[in-house]
Amino acid sequence: MYFGLSEDQIFFQDNIKKFLEENSSVDILRKIAADDRTFAKDIHDGIVNLGINGLLVPEEFGGLGLDILFAAAISESLGYGAGATPFIGSYVMAPIAIIDGGSDEQKQKYLTKIVSNEVKFGVGFSALTGARDNSEIQIKGNKISGRSLFIL
């Protein structure tokens, strides 16, 4: 039995590595950190153009409908080139949560927006104190704001 990556997975990895080699550097990452940004929009948009945003989204919603192993291969490539992008939260955790727990209406609304790059999701999973404290969460309109120890 073969346990290596498929040709398609290797192709995706190679394209992302090449893009990051050409467009990301330590100097760029330092500038992002100095500007207090979480990611570089131009680098992120370039990686999105390679198709990562629709990776796990089913084809019926405009995505590629691939599996979590594909996401792991992409994650490895992003780490190789220090790709500062909201990959895990927006393109792995959010689609999985919406697919598994969302209504048909929510799937149509949000999965298509993930694929079209209209939205980016963040996933917070621990309060600043490490304990669950809903008083730190504020809702303004349909957006949640607040602080958390870990945001992906």
Regions found by a protein language model. Give the residues of each.
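Intrinsic disorder at enzyme termini
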Residues: M1-D8
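Conserved "HGTGT" condensation-loop signature of ketosynthase/thiolase-family condensing enzymes
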Residues: D14
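Fold-independent oxyanion-binding glycine-rich loops
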Residues: N23, L78, Y91, G101-G102, ...
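Short secondary-structure junction/hinge motifs that connect adjacent elements
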Residues: D27-N49
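Internal helix-loop-helix
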Residues: N49-Q108, T112-N117, L152
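Glycine-rich, Trp-frequent "lid" loop and neighboring beta-strands that shape
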Residues: G63-L64, E105-L152
